[in-house]
Amino acid sequence: MKTLSIDIETYSSVDLAKCGVYKYTEAPDFDILLFGYSVEGSPVQVVDLACGEMIPAEIIAALTDTGVTKWAFNAQFERICLSRWLR
């Protein structure tokens, strides 16, 4: 795997616009609800984490693999949210 495109949908009771991404992700109820991904431009797969679906192990591994280029529309937000979620 050389490239991974990602998009997430999240929830937090903290107002993102007022408090910023770090406070948003530090809220006890912060969660990633949906995780969309595409490997090497393949059709997009959506994982419904809110309903108990699991992100495939190879995708989790790719998130921390420095040899895989990650793409996201709001990369800094996605990076911070995923870093918090992966703890």
Locate each region found by the language model.
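Conserved DEDDh/DEDDy metal-dependent 3′-5′ exonuclease domain
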Residues: K2-S5, T10, D15-C19, E26, ...
